[in-house]
Amino acid sequence: MVYNLGMENTTLIVLVEDDSFISGMYQTKLKNAGYNVEVIADGELAWERLQKDPLPKLLLLDVILPKKDGFEILEDLRKEDRTKNLPVILLTNLGQKPDVERGVKLGANDYIIKAHFTPSEVMERVEKVLHASN
């Protein structure tokens, strides 16, 4: 599948993932689709980045992170006027029903269990969330 053909895309996506193999794979897929991508490997640095401009158009957020987990980040984002409507996709290995329910309750726009989706399917979900937020 081909994403964002044609005009250059300036859409910024922040990817928060501490596994360098996974972050590298998604960074490549997103860049090949024309997105600008910032990769951050720990939750505390991600939180600090999200307090600055420009805000990304989408946050792809792992849950299990060093220093501050993705659930905490999501909960804090939804409390702040500046970031309460920021689209967030949780991209995680946590696949138990209580984890999914918690992510949805905290306000995730989508919840993707890494082992259940191919990178192409994740890209489709990214496109869907970005389209819905415009």
Regions found by a protein language model. Give the residues of each.
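Conserved acidic carboxylate
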Residues: E17
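Charged docking surfaces used in two-component/phosphorelay signaling
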Residues: G24-N32
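Acidic, metal-coordinating helix/loop segments flanking the phosphotransfer/catalytic sites
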Residues: V39-L58
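Active-site residues of response regulator receiver
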Residues: D62, T92
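The feature encodes the CheY-like receiver
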Residues: P66, K84, Q96
